[in-house]
Regions:
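Juxtamembrane transition segments at transmembrane-helix termini in multipass membrane proteins
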Residues: 2-6, 18, 55-67, 80-101, ...
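Interfacial aromatic "cap" segments that immediately flank transmembrane helices
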Residues: 3-4, 8-9, 13-43, 103-133, ...
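Residue-level signature of transmembrane alpha-helical entry/exit and packing/kink sites
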Residues: 30, 66-70, 74, 119-120, ...
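Transmembrane-helix bundle segments that line or gate the permeation/cavity pathway
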Residues: 37-38, 44-53, 77, 81-88
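Long, highly hydrophobic alpha-helical transmembrane signal-anchor segments
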Residues: 42-67, 119-154, 232-236
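Generic hydrophobic, aliphatic-rich segments that mediate packing or membrane embedding
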Residues: 71, 75, 84-91, 105, ...
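Short, surface-exposed helix-loop/turn micro-motifs enriched in polar/charged residues
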Residues: 101-102, 148
Length: 292
């Protein structure tokens, strides 16, 4: 039986701890489905990239073919990012609707994700012009203000980045998951973030540090393995070297994508916490109907 409470306002500590509680409970089912749904697309991108590296000399002067390959990689990568972001949202949504379930099937997840994709794509396109361009302008302004004060610039940029992670993920959840129009969703998110803002921002900051640490390990360990293998045995074959690089990059990227789920789920907990009163009212209403 699913005894995890989704609709609950959480403070800083509970947001962090309950994120790990959720993954301790559902990790096996969650990540098996995650790899099943996203793995094929991820491997396809890796294989195309590996072949590009191996046979680069063959088509390096063929610009139309080169541009086509880059375009295909770009489209596949965009869809991979969308699937990665939508997956935990879809998984949680299915558990919300079926409180007694302890596992979800990949087919169900794919159906929900497929329905989310059009709004997710539209959200990305609109936000690029409405949110991201002004954000990049803000970063340039900060760079001009702080000038050569590199440390202050890095602190200000990092703080702005954490705020942006919190804001954009909450914005996407309201727009994609709740189905509000763009600007009503924007107003709702701004209003919601005013409540317990520092709890939400602090939890986002700490989770980002945790993810960065695991991601760094996922990148550094393959690099150490690469240099160790090259130093001890060496690989003369271009194909062998390419396969080695591909395998190590695949390992590192897989770690990065997997740990990103912790941040996304934390944002889902923040989002669902705003619905606690609404959900409680629904339960009370059902209870009244039963009594009648």
């Amino acid at each position: 039986m699913n005894d995890f409470v989704f609709y609950k306002k959480r403070d800083f500590g509970m947001l962090i701890s309950d994120t790990f509680v959720f993954f301790r409970k559902y990790a096996k089912n969650f990540f098996s489905n995650y790899l099943l749904i996203n793995g094929a697309l991820f491997i396809l991108i890796g294989v195309i990239a590996a072949f590009m590296f191996i046979f680069y000399d063959v088509y390096s002067n063929n610009w139309p073919l080169l541009l086509l390959i880059f375009a295909v990689l770009g489209v596949l990568s965009a869809f991979l990012v969308l699937f990665v972001i939508c997956f935990p949202i879809a998984y949680t949504q299915l558990l919300e609707k079926n409180a007694d379930r302890s596992s979800i099937k990949a087919k169900e997840l794919f159906v929900v994700i497929r329905k989310m994709l059009p709004r997710a794509i539209l959200f990305g396109i609109i936000s690029f012009f409405i949110i991201l361009i002004p954000y990049f302008i803000l970063i340039l302004v900060l760079a001009r203000i702080f000038g050569h004060q590199i440390i202050l610039m890095q602190i200000a940029s990092y703080f702005a980045g954490i705020v942006m992670i919190l804001f954009m993920q909450q914005f996407m959840l309201v727009y994609v998951k709740d189905g509000l129009d763009y600007f009503p969703a924007l107003r709702k998110v701004i209003q919601e973030l005013k409540e317990r803002f520092w709890d939400k921002l602090g939890a986002t900051f700490v989770m980002n540090l945790i993810i960065t640490a695991f991601s760094a390990a996922g990148i550094v360990v393959p690099l150490v393995l690469y240099f160790t293998i090259m130093l001890l045995i060496g690989i003369d074959s271009l194909i062998g070297l390419s396969l080695l690089i591909f395998t190590l990059v695949l390992i590192g990227a897989t770690v990065v994508f997997i740990v990103s789920n912790f941040q996304i789920f934390l944002q889902i907990l923040i989002h669902l916490g705003e619905k606690e009163e609404e959900h409680t009212d629904d339960i009370d209403l059902i209870g009244k109907h039963v009594e009648e």
